[in-house]
C-alpha cells in the first residue's frame, strides 16, 4: 500500500428535503450566485423552481444549456458572466456535466488567458484560485459532487481533457435521491456504468490493498444490485439513494487510497467522446470488457479472478483463467441487462479515426506508462477494433 493523503472537504446534505439546508449552508460563501443548469430537465421536473424558491434572498444569475460532455465555449460564457455580475459563488443544479462546467468556470474567473489553456495545464499549476462551488445533484454518475476533477471538451479540436485541483472540490452538495426519480432509464444505465468504471479503474492494480479492495467490491455490488431496480422502478427511494451515495464514494479518493491508478478505459473513452460526442457511460460500457480481455494475462490473473469471485460469485474451484473469463462475461451481461450498447458499430462508429485517437491518447495521457498494464498506441487501436 502506497502512502496517501485523504481529505473530503465537501459538506454533504443527504436525504429527503435537504434542499432546505442550502440557504444556510451557502450564505457564508456569498449571496451573488451563478446558477448553472443543463438543457432543460431541471425546468421540466420542477427542481430548478424549488432551488430558486429556496434561494429567494440571494441574487441569482442563470447560465443554462450545458451540454453532456460540457464545452469550453460554455465555460467561456460563464467566466464572462461571473466577471460582469461580480459572482461570489457558483451553484450547479444538475449532473456531472453541469458540475464539471461550473468547476471550470469557477477556476476560469481567476485565470489570465483562455480557459482551454487552463484545462490543458491544470496539472502544471494553472489553477491557483477558484470561486466556491456548490451542487444540487440530479443524476448519480460522475461523482463530481465530491471530487476535484472536471472534464471539459473542445469540439473545435476534437479533444476532451480532465482538469484536476483540490480547489475544484465542491464546498456543499445537496443530495436528495428524490431529485433523481425523473432520470430516464437510459441515463440511469449509463450513469451506473460510469460509477462502476470509476471503481474498476482503481480496483485493478498490483498493490496489496486488502481493505480498499473489499470496499470497492462492496460498492460494485451495490451498483449491480440497485441499477436494475432504479430502471424498472424509477421512484424506488432506496435504489436511487444507494446509487447516489455509491456514485460519490466511487471517486472521492477512498477507493484509490494507497493505490496507483491508471484510468486507461477513461482515457480511451475520452477520445471517443471527443470525436463522436457519445454518452460517456455508454462508451465505458463498450470499452471496459474488451480492455479486460486484452490485458488478461498471468500478471493480471489474480485480480481478475478475485473480481469474478468476490463481485459476481463465480465458483472459486474453477481454474483461475476460467474464473476471470466468466467474470468479464458477467460484467458484459450486466451491461446488456441495462440495455446498454455493446458495440461501437451500433452507434455508427467505424475505425477510420482509431489510429489518430490511439496516438492522441498515448501522447497526451499517462496510458503508455500505466503502472498496471501500459498500452502502446497500437494496443489502444487494437482495443478499439475489438469494440466494433
Predicted regions and their residues:
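Short Gly/Thr/Asp-enriched flexible loops that form oxyanion-binding sites at enzyme active sites
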Residues: 77-79, 98-112, 146-147
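Active-site segments that bind and position negatively charged phosphate/pyrophosphate groups
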Residues: 202-330
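C-terminal charged capping/lid subdomain of soluble metabolic enzymes
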Residues: 304, 311-388
